[in-house]
Amino acid sequence: LQIFADAYTPVVDSSAIPTGEIASVEGTPMDFRTEKQIGQDIRADFEQLHFTGGYDHNYVLGRPGEKKIMANAYCRESGIALEAETDCCGVQFYAGNFIGEQTGKGGASYHDRSAFCLESQFYPNAVNEPDFPSPVVKAGDTYHTETSYRFYLR
């Protein structure tokens, strides 16, 4: 996985509500600016990962309305690759920490961390954080955003 973000929004505890800070990913297990396996640092002794049982954090992408690549992902086993692009200011990366035991299509077995999500968004709790970009749309205004996920073989 590669996430094109220099910062993330730390959370206060296991509730995963952001503290209101924006923190650099540099030198932390949160740093996905260079492609790495999701599991490489997921068990690191890092408070933010302890709070959420792994990755479940918002990454700071830039100003809303600016289209940018938010993430790339690649599976070596299948050769399937993903390029995700958005004009949102944040992306929530969730590493499937609490999937539990599930049976899927064709009897496939799914368990904790057998999948991940990249969810374009405003920062969580932004309505209560004056320094975060505002997600409020006023009556009569129109809101539009665009996120695309392109899958291909690499």
Language-model-detected regions and their locations in the chain:
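An exposed, glycine/acidic-rich loop-and-rim segment of catalytic or binding clefts
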Residues: 1-154
